[in-house]
Design a protein with these regions (language model features):
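Structured alpha-helical bundle/scaffold domains in large eukaryotic membrane-trafficking regulators
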Residues: 56-60, 111, 193, 197-200
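N-terminal alpha-helical membrane-insertion module
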Residues: 1-67
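Amphipathic alpha-helical scaffolding segments
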Residues: 93-94, 169-170, 238-240
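Serine-dependent carboxylesterase/thioesterase catalytic core
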Residues: 133-232
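Short secondary-structure boundary/capping segments
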Residues: 121, 193-197, 235-239
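C-terminal catalytic-base region of ester-bond hydrolases, centering on the histidine
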Residues: 212-403
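Active-site catalytic motif of lipid deacylating hydrolases and related acyltransferases
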Residues: 1-8, 63-150, 186, 347-350, ...
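Structured catalytic/translocation cores of nucleotide/phosphate-coupled proteins
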Residues: 76, 128-136, 143-154, 167-168, ...
């Protein structure tokens, strides 16, 4: 309650300050006094925010036994707007409980909701790296270059999605996995790399066949009624080549990480573990598989003339290249269509914009569920997904040894 009361006071305080600026200009107040006034207001604001903010990073404090097999993994969380150290601790504790791994929270300190939103606009529209971005960059880069870890999992929420789109280093990315919730960013990149990273004498044909994305896996989770996601990820995934990664859109409202996202997508049971079944993960979807990708015509086996929002999802990065076909995280052409008529307008959407496939032709369908496409779901309760990227590197090394 104290934290909430401070935030409410800051909203009123900051709005009053912003409203006073045009009044001061109209009254032609002395410039020196105006600067002193602004400095005083911002100084008081920082003192108040000091009650909310804490150290640069926090570690989860859940008292559970972690399997030794997870010692080579590093989980990092970057919070969104208006999150002080208390709420950050609650977020990383919930994540640690969900995935049974220690989680480090890199604190994106709050300056109050109004000023935080202004910072979001600065970071997103001008790609400006604030001090928060630089601190987070150092934490992630240190983890990537640390030989003690062979997998780095980055979880981003809200404004953390903006900062994550700015801080991802351009080297050592094969160890990195990124999962976002309510992403407020306007872009998310994932450049290509090929086996020449590991093999010096690979020929051009083999290289083309093994071109993959630099970051092993990117997934974005969003609520259709989350206003932050609406002017962030749900808006900019419509633009080709701007947002890479698989998108999971759940019908629903709310933006808070624990209360709205994790409780809906990774609900806990009475024993403190993630339930094996929940409404969102059990949503039935249809994966369209390619039969002939060289034809100019496209045909859907689902009902024609589906309305907007019915569940038809497209690959959106607009590249048409057979060398990349069927390589995007197990989705043959990354076009998924909702199959449960009883759900209606509340259908869950899954979109894989990692896929470079432009044309979808003569498909045959197979029914799967949301959980079958969610890699993050495979981490629940301390489990792990198959190490696909590591297997690829090992196979590449074996091929090099045989040449």
């Amino acid at each position: 309650m104290v934290t909430l009361a401070i935030h409410l006071f800051l909203i009123v305080y900051q709005l009053a300050f912003l409203a006073s600026i045009p009044v001061w200009i109209i009254l032609h107040g002395p410039a020196l006094w105006f600067l002193v006034y602004c400095a005083s207001v911002l100084g008081v604001n920082n003192l108040i925010c000091g009650l909310l903010n804490g150290p640069a990073y926090l570690d989860s404090k859940i008292d559970i036994a972690y399997p030794e097999s997870h010692n080579k993994e590093r989980w990092i969380f970057l919070n969104g707007v208006a999150v002080g150290s208390h709420w950050l601790q609650a977020n990383i504790d919930r994540l640690a409980l969900t995935f049974r791994r220690p989680v480090r929270g890199v604190h994106n300190p709050t300056a109050g909701i109004v000023f935080d939103l202004a910072q979001c606009l600065l970071e997103r529209n001008f790609s400006y790296s604030t001090d928060d971005v630089r601190v987070a960059y150092k934490q992630i880069k240190d983890a990537l270059v640390d030989s003690n870890y062979d997998k780095i999992v980055l979880i981003l929420h809200s404004q953390g999605g903006i900062q994550g789109s700015l801080i991802v280093p351009q080297t050592l990315l094969s160890q990195l996995e990124i999962y976002t919730f309510g992403n407020a960013a306007n872009h998310f990149n994932n450049p290509h790399w090929d086996l020449r990273t590991y093999l010096s004498n690979i020929n051009a044909e083999t290289q083309r066949d093994h071109t993959i994305k630099s970051i092993g896996h990117i997934e974005h989770y969003a609520h259709s009624g989350d206003f932050v996601a609406q002017w962030g990820i749900l808006n900019f995934t419509k633009v080709a080549n701007w947002f890479m990664g698989r998108v999971f859109e759940r019908p629903g409202d709310g933006h808070l990480l624990n209360q709205h996202y994790l409780n809906a997508m990774f609900p806990l049971g009475d024993d403190g573990t993630v339930r094996e079944k929940n409404e969102f993960m059990e949503t039935a979807v249809q994966m369209a598989e390619p039969k002939d990708c060289d034809s100019e015509a496209a045909s859907h086996e689902t009902a024609p003339a589906l309305p907007v929002g019915s569940g038809v999802v497209r690959a959106t990065n607009g590249i048409n290249s057979s060398s990349h076909r069927n390589r995007r995280e197990g989705m043959l052409e990354s076009l998924i269509t909702h199959m449960t008529p009883s759900v209606g307008a509340g259908s869950s959407l899954v979109q894989d914009v990692n896929s470079p496939v432009h044309k979808i032709v003569n498909r045959q369908s197979s029914t799967l569920r949301v959980k079958d496409f969610s890699r993050l779901w495979q981490y629940r309760n301390g489990k792990s997904p198959p190490p696909e990227a590591q297997q690829l590197r090992e196979e590449a090394a074996k091929r090099q040894a045989s040449w």
